[in-house]
Amino acid sequence: MGFTVDVANRLVTVDHSHNNYSVTTPAGNPTVLTLSNGLKVTSIFSRTKGKKGKRGVKAPPGDNSPMLYALKGMHQLQTTRRAVMDLNLSYRQILPVYVAAGFQWDWLLPLPSSSNLTALFANRVCSRSGVGVCHHGAMVKISAQQVLKNLEALQIKATDRSAIREAVNRFIKYNSPQTAFQIKAISRTSLRPYINPLMWGHLPAVVPPRRVLLIDDMVTTGTSLVCASDILRHRYPTVQIEALTLFGSTK
């Protein structure tokens, strides 16, 4: 089953007759992706290409991830209780497949987000699996102002630097220099790996972990997950890391 977008009513629902945007049945899930730094990322629901509209017709809202946007309340999209129940039914069958694969984590670390969806997903994984402890706030986003400061030290092409600066300044225009920067504000995905959008946050005094499971709502370029894993390895050199996301990549 996939997702159907009712553009007129800004409503996203689960549809059993196709796999547009995502495969949400236990069959075919979870999926695995390996990022550039070797990080293994498992996704509960794989993503597919949405149904293409006719030439000249505006694409449906949601940037090819309409259900994610609906769950986060973005683009004025919404969903139904029935659709959430359908997804949860599949999730409860898919998660045990990942747990049974053998990676037993000490910590679950949700990545910071402007929405509470990632935190809720992390809590659900923790309670459903009964494995590890969930630590919120271990990773935080850097400010847009800090992104601009870091940009000056990067040894990259002048054209790339200019494009990133333009994207960050556009973000600041609609927010503020102190606002936590959102990596998706850089529309050219090839430029995102130049930016480290995260830094270490705060954790109470705890025993260093042997294994950590990073949690995010979706993986696209994987920039944030790569940065988070690099931060962890710098702090805990021997730690083993994997990542789990709600929705996968369309790659």
Give the positions of each predicted feature.
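Active-site-facing substrate-recognition patch
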Residues: 3-107, 123, 137-208, 251
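A structural signal for isolated positions on well-ordered beta-strands in alpha/beta enzyme cores
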Residues: 107, 213, 242-244
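Gly/Ser/Thr-rich loops at beta-strand to alpha-helix junctions
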Residues: 112-119, 219-223
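Active-site signature of alpha/beta-hydrolase-fold catalytic machinery across serine-
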Residues: 124, 227-231
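Long compositionally biased, domain-poor regions of proteins
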Residues: 127-137
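A phosphate-binding catalytic loop at a beta-strand-loop-alpha-helix junction
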Residues: 214-228
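ATP-dependent adenylation/pyrophosphate-handling site
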Residues: 231-251
